[in-house]
Amino acid sequence: MEWLREPYCISTDKTKLDVGMIHHFLYTTAYWAVGRPMSIVRKTIENSLCFGLYEGETQVGFARVVTDYATFGWMCDVFILPSHRGRGLGKWLVECVVAHPDVKGLRRILLSSRDAQELYQKYGGFHALHYPDNWMEKFTETPFRKVKPSDLPEENKSHR
């Protein structure tokens, strides 16, 4: 599926993805994925519905949804390269992701963001969890991402 806004295009065609660029941005810049190895990036792409944002043939943004294609999705790894920010591309990317036929029918889509909640609220229809006390998460240390006490919510720091 493709969306066009000259000179930009958003595509779900995984063969167009510049996996090297995606890996470089996530590995070096994305606070949620710094240090993520190429092998993990490849595996996440293989197992997700991916959205590449391109200027001509050059990829300048990315997003993916981990989903069962029936009831649930997790939107993640959303970014626009710094040189293309301020042009409404993040807004457009979020709008396209939530409008995709395989996403818009899902009962629940989650995401996590420490700095773009307003964008996701306005352009994706997201809001804070209705019942945050019902949700749980599990942090797992991996070779590329060690859980630090600073990663945990304030109330959990004493339990580490």
PLM segments and residue spans:
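A conserved beta-strand-loop-helix scaffold within acyl/acetyltransferase catalytic domains
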Residues: 39-79
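Conserved acetyl-CoA pyrophosphate-binding loop and the N-cap/start of the following alpha-helix
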Residues: 84-93
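Conserved active-site alpha-helix within GNAT-family acetyltransferase domains
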Residues: 103-141
